[in-house]
Amino acid sequence: MESKQLHSIIGIWTNACRFLLAVVFIFSGFVKAVDPLGTQYKIQDYLEAFGWAASVPAFLPFLASILQAMVEFCLGVYLLFGIRRRMTTLFVVLIMGVMTPLTLWLALSNPISDCGCFGDAVTLTNWETFGKNVFLLIAAASVFKWGNRITPLVTKRFDWLVAMYAFLYISGMTLYCYHELPVFDFRPYHIGADIRKGMEIPEGAKPTVYETRFILQKMEWRKNLH
């Protein structure tokens, strides 16, 4: 009896983790796809934080933004429908295994204010992002360990059709939003937004302080002006 109950609990837990990860990956991939340039700028922020910006070709951040959106979205769809369970869960646990320590470093050193996990749609602090990733890593490890407990929503005869549709959909969405405007614009100054209201400093927030410095130098004489 205990064995059957444990088997049932593991199955429920695994599928709950599977659906949670599917929603997160689909949403994350989608919001990156609707604003590929915004994702590119965030990747450039990461490169600058690591000191790699000067050594990386200019086209790579944009290419990486497209690939990231497509991979996350497709993995989410694969998890949702239970397609290629072993391969999908392996990729998911590897991604979370890399992102979790990375976000811990971001939380400790704070080189950038927002990880960009969900684009401009949802803004999280670095510590909130790390906490989220710890939970998702546990979920990813669970679906990887008990991947055979994932209940497929489509048969193997039709899983290729779902996979192809997911790939074509997210590819088309990314290219359309690159050439046109985002179909869902999460940016702070989107069309129809009140720019004056958007520029207001929130109550209690510290205003940005700028310092202008001029350096006058002639031969060995040098003077700083503030």
PLM regions and their residue ranges:
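Interfacial/capping segments of alpha-helical transmembrane domains
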Residues: K32-D45
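Membrane-interface helix-boundary motifs at transmembrane edges
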Residues: F81-T88, N148-F158
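Functionalized membrane-embedded alpha-helices
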Residues: G11-A33, A58-L102
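Membrane-interface segments at or immediately adjacent to transmembrane helices
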Residues: G172-H226
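Membrane-embedded alpha-helical segments of integral membrane proteins
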Residues: G97-I150
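Internal/C-terminal transmembrane anchor helices
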Residues: L153-V183
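Perimembrane loop-to-helix junctions flanking transmembrane segments
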Residues: K42-A58
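Short, Lys/Arg-rich, polar N-terminal cytosolic tail immediately upstream
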Residues: M1-I12
